């Protein structure tokens, strides 16, 4: 069976700080992994596809990296109100 684990479950950083979110898979997923952010009342917004390609109109504060079974999302210059998937809660300290 295919397994996908997003970590950490929660991360905190100050406004303007940087956080890293990891996605570990049981098989190679690098060409198929995409990162989305939820939008209340709307479909999720695509941030990154093919593990590291920034979607059109998305800020360069978001960076995808890694390959194979471990893919990473790095978010820099944090702002309030950022959240990612059901797997990671991002708390921005004001």
UniProtKB/Swiss-Prot annotation:
One of its GO terms (biological process) is adaptive immune response. It holds the Pfam family V-set. Residues 24-34 are annotated as: Complementarity-determining-1. SUPFAM superfamilies: Immunoglobulin. Keywords: Adaptive immunity, Immunity, Immunoglobulin. Residues 50-56 are annotated as: Complementarity-determining-2. InterPro entries: Ig-like_dom_sf, Ig-like_fold, Ig_V-set, IgV_Light_Chain. Residues 1-23 are annotated as: Framework-1. Residues 35-49 are annotated as: Framework-2. It comes from the Eukaryota. Residues 84-93 are annotated as: Framework-4. Residues 83 are annotated as: Complementarity-determining-3. Residues 57-82 are annotated as: Framework-3. GO terms for cellular component: immunoglobulin complex. This chain is an antibody to pneumococcus strain III vaccine. This is Ig kappa-B5 chain V region 2699. It comes from Oryctolagus cuniculus.
